[in-house]
Amino acid sequence: MINRQQGFTLLEVMAALAIFSMLSVLAFMIFSQASELHQRSQKEIQQFNQLQRTITILDNDLLQLVARRNRSTDKIMVLGEEAIFTTQSRDPLAPLSEAQTLLTVHWYLRNHTLYRAVRTSVDGRKDQPAQAMLEHVESFLLESNSGESQELPLSVTLHLQTQQYGGLQRRFALPEQLAREESPAQTQAGNNNHE
């Protein structure tokens, strides 16, 4: 009679366990790296969306700009490291048929976070609670592209320095009808010259 061995030897079982263990460790490492990469890419996407949303809201604010002198600043637009100007907006919770309302918006940088504060009373001094728009901002500057002589510029340039994207620059054209309208001070000066 032939004595046939049934099953595996101890050496074969140990070799199979070692191979299975190595494959399990490799699979875990691959899964862990894929999960880490996914989390990192989601964070990058979220930060980019936050930047894009901030620029879109600033663009909308500037496109809806109203040439109205603010009583607290006595200017139509305050530009620089803080920006204050009047814009028109519709309350998203109000019915669509409701007219747009005037708002004073205030963009400013505090503790590496860019904020947007809104005053629903355009000549009021008290902002509603500011909304954090963009984090990890090193500098924020809005500047006029029409020189210092003109109170209402034709366009403004945003200079934004972020930790993630470095220096960003974006030019925003102001509404064309504002460029054609003269401010009251310019109209008075023009009338005085004709007399």
Swiss-Prot record:
Principal location class: membrane
Q: Which InterPro entries match?
A: N_methyl_site, Pilin-like, T2SS_protein-GspJ, T2SS_protein_J
Q: Which Pfam families match?
A: N_methyl (PF07963), T2SSJ (PF11612)
Q: Which cysteines are joined by disulfide bonds?
A: none
Where in the cell is the protein located?
Answer: Cell inner membrane
Positions bearing N-methylphenylalanine? F8
The protein's PTM annotation reads: Cleaved by prepilin peptidase. Methylated by prepilin peptidase at the amino group of the N-terminal phenylalanine once the leader sequence is cleaved by prepilin peptidase.
A cellular component term from Gene Ontology for this protein is:
type II protein secretion system complex
User: Ion transport among the record's keywords?
Assistant: no
Q: Cite the propeptide residues by number.
A: 1-7
Miscellaneous information on this protein = Part of a cryptic operon that encodes proteins involved in type II secretion machinery in other organisms, but is not expressed in strain K12.
Q: Which family does it belong to?
A: Belongs to the GSP J family.
Role: Component of the type II secretion system required for the energy-dependent secretion of extracellular factors such as proteases and toxins from the periplasm. Part of the pseudopilus tip complex that is critical for the recognition and binding of secretion substrates.
Quaternary structure and interacting proteins, as annotated: Type II secretion is composed of four main components: the outer membrane complex, the inner membrane complex, the cytoplasmic secretion ATPase and the periplasm-spanning pseudopilus. Interacts with core component GspG.
Which PANTHER family does the protein's record reference? TYPE II SECRETION SYSTEM PROTEIN J, TYPE II SECRETION SYSTEM PROTEIN J-RELATED
UniProt name for this protein? Type II secretion system protein J
Q: Which organism is it from?
A: Escherichia coli (strain K12)
